Amino acid sequence: MSMQDPISDMLTRLRNGQTAKKVAVKMPSSKQKVAIAALLKEEGFVAEFTVTGDVKPELEVTLKYFEANPVIEQIQRVSRPGLRIYKKKDALPSVMGGLGIAVVSTSKGLMTDRAARKAGLGGEIICYVA
């Protein structure tokens, strides 16, 4: 069976992994998934990520916990294949009053809502993480 929305699959694996108190989760790799994992690591939501394998690359994300509680409280897909959500630079959302991030796909690549606002770019809202 083919996967219709690989980004939703990634976010669901992260959410389920943290609910089950897993140390790490594995998933098929893609450039966009690696970019999202890099943003999550940069913002402190995950501990580490690695890409292994040449023929079928696999992304392994090491989850992060604080006092036995998951660091990611909420992770939600916004723009999806059936309904794309685009926002201009002035309309970019602030997640949990700035405590969370919105991952935005811009013409300059994936970045957080704060970085997109600073660069004066709008784009597709991929997901919210808090």
Curated annotation (Swiss-Prot):
Any one Gene Ontology biological process term?
translation
Which Pfam family would be a valid example here? Ribosomal_S8
Which cellular component, as a GO term, is one annotated location? ribosome
Query: Has keyword Ribonucleoprotein?
Result: yes
Q: Which SUPFAM superfamilies match?
A: Ribosomal protein S8
One MF term from GO for this chain? rRNA binding
InterPro entries named in the record: Ribosomal_uS8, Ribosomal_uS8_CS, Ribosomal_uS8_sf
Keywords, ordered alphabetically: Ribonucleoprotein, Ribosomal protein, RNA-binding, rRNA-binding
- Per the record, the domain of life is Bacteria
Of which family is this protein a member?
Belongs to the universal ribosomal protein uS8 family.
Question: How does the annotation summarize its subunit structure?
Answer: Part of the 30S ribosomal subunit. Contacts proteins S5 and S12.
Q: What does this protein do?
A: One of the primary rRNA binding proteins, it binds directly to 16S rRNA central domain where it helps coordinate assembly of the platform of the 30S subunit.
Name-wise, this protein is Small ribosomal subunit protein uS8
Its gene name is rpsH
